Amino acid sequence: MLELWQTEWCPASRRVRQRLTELGIDYLIRQVPVEKDDRDALRAAVGTETIPALVFDNGEIAVGEEAILHLLDTALAEPAEADAHRQKAAKARRRYLEEECECSQPATP
């Protein structure tokens, strides 16, 4: 099973998770500490403290959003339902921002 080394707060990690989901790929998430000095497990597994990093079943490692997405997009065919998933995710994200967290609301003095 693929292993994604990532953090929840990282926008690049989020985009990689989204793409893996669109492609219907199961993967294991490895949470990485915020501080680079605390990333010994990541360094041991992939040789760097950069996130996101994706480790494939065959031992191949891709580091960084651009490298991971390029590898996924060139190696795998997108399933028919990927676009529908993308649209639903974007709609849910907008709804959350508008209704739940009120992030898009202007600050009131």
Predicted regions and their residues:
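GST-like domain detector, emphasizing the conserved glutathione-binding G-site
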Residues: 1-8, 12-109
